[in-house]
From Swiss-Prot:
Catalyzes the phosphorylation of the position 2 hydroxy group of 4-diphosphocytidyl-2C-methyl-D-erythritol. Transmembrane segments: none annotated. Disulfide bonds: none annotated. Its EC number is 2.7.1.148. The gene is ispE. This is 4-diphosphocytidyl-2-C-methyl-D-erythritol kinase. It is an enzyme of class 2 (transferase). ATP binds at residues 97-107. HAMAP family: IspE. It catalyses: 4-CDP-2-C-methyl-D-erythritol + ATP = 4-CDP-2-C-methyl-D-erythritol 2-phosphate + ADP + H(+). Keywords: ATP-binding, Isoprene biosynthesis, Kinase, Nucleotide-binding, Transferase. One of its GO terms (molecular function) is ATP binding. The active site is at 14, 139.
Length: 284
C-alpha cells in the first residue's frame, strides 16, 4: 500500500464539553482545562501527490489568501521541516463553519499534517507532529493525537479519556466569533479553580459563554431555543451551540425544526478521530 498517491480524509468537528479558564500567563496565553470530544462529521480534504514542489490548495477556501490558509501553512511547515522535494494538491470541501468553535481550521491543519506524513513518508511520530501543529494553533495537537481528552496548560497537555457515545445537534447561528477577541476581552472570566476530583460533574460549563452571549445576542437566542429540547451549551468561544441526546432520532428532531436563519448538523461522538480511523484503513 506504499504506492498510494492520492486519497481523501475527513477533518472532524470537535466539541468542548466543558471549558474552564484558570488564569492568564505572562506571555498572554491562557491556562485552561477543557474536555474535547470528536464528531463523525467534518470538512473533507483530498490529497494528490505531485512531483513538483508546489503546494496547491483549492476548493472552499472562503476567499482566504493561500499563504494565510492553515491547510497551506501546515503543508509548508512539514515540507520545510522535513526538506521534502515533492509537492501536493489539496482540495477542501468545507462543511464546518468558520468562527463557530468546532475546530474547523485547526482540524484541517491537523488532518493535513497527518495525511502528508503518510503521503510524503516523513514518518514523524504523533508527538513530533503535535509539536509542529502547536505552531499553527493551540487546538491542533488534540486533533493530531485524535483521542477524546482533557486538555490542560494552554491546551497542549492531553489526558486521554473514554466517553460514552452520544448524539449531538450542533447549531451555527450564522454569527462569526473571533477567538482572539474573546480571549483578550477584559470581562472574560479567568479565575476558575483547576479541577480536583471527578471531572464529569463539570460537563456543560463554559467560561466563555456569558461573555459571548453578551457580545453576540444571537448566541443567547440559539441557546434559549435549544433549551426546548435539552440542556444547551456553547462550544469553545462560539458561536456554535449544541444539545446532547442518547439517540440519533432525538437529534434529528431538533434539526428538522431548526429556524431557517440558522445552519446545523447532527453527528455522533467518537473516542478516536475519524481522520485516524480513515488513515489506518488506507495505510495499515
Amino acid at each position: 500500500m506504499n504506492n498510494i498517491t492520492s486519497f481523501s480524509l475527513i477533518a472532524p468537528a470537535k466539541l468542548n464539553l466543558f471549558l474552564h479558564i484558570n488564569g492568564r500567563r505572562d506571555d498572554g496565553y491562557h491556562e485552561l482545562e477543557t474536555l474535547f470530544t470528536f464528531l463523525n462529521y467534518g470538512d473533507e480534504l483530498s490529497f494528490e501527490l505531485s512531483d513538483l514542489p508546489a503546494i496547491i490548495v483549492t476548493g472552499d477556501t472562503n476567499g482566504i489568501a493561500t499563504t494565510d490558509n492553515l491547510i497551506y501553512k501546515a503543508a509548508l511547515l512539514l515540507q520545510t521541516q522535513c526538506k521534502i522535494k515533492q509537492g501536493v494538491k489539496i482540495n477542501l470541501i468545507k462543511r464546518l463553519p468558520m468562527g463557530g468553535g468546532v475546530g474547523g481550521g485547526s482540524s484541517d491543519a491537523a488532518s493535513t499534517l497527518l495525511a502528508l506524513n503518510k503521503l510524503w513518508k516523513t514518518a514523524l511520530s504523533l508527538d513530533e507532529l503535535a509539536h509542529l501543529g502547536l505552531q499553527l494553533g493551540a487546538d491542533v495537537p488534540v486533533f493530531i493525537h485524535g483521542k477524546s481528552a482533557i486538555a490542560h496548560g494552554i491546551g497542549e497537555q492531553l489526558e486521554q479519556v473514554m466517553l460514552e457515545q452520544k448524539w449531538y445537534c450542533v447549531v451555527f447561528p450564522n454569527q462569526h466569533v473571533s477567538t482572539a477577541k474573546i480571549f483578550t476581552h477584559p470581562e472574560l472570566k479567568r479565575d476558575t479553580p483547576k479541577i480536583s476530583g471527578d471531572w464529569q460533574q463539570h460537563i456543560l460549563t463554559n467560561d466563555c459563554e456569558s461573555l459571548v452571549k453578551k457580545l453576540c445576542p444571537e448566541v443567547e437566542k440559539t441557546l434559549q431555543w435549544l433549551l426546548k429540547y435539552a440542556p444547551s451549551k456553547m462550544t469553545g468561544t462560539g458561536s456554535c451551540c449544541f444539545v446532547e441526546f442518547a439517540t440519533q432520532v432525538q437529534a434529528q428532531d431538533v434539526l428538522a425544526n431548526l429556524p431557517h436563519t440558522w445552519q446545523g448538523f447532527i453527528a455522533s461522538s467518537v473516542n478516536t478521530s475519524p481522520a485516524h480511523t480513515e488513515l489506518a484503513a488506507i495505510f495499515d
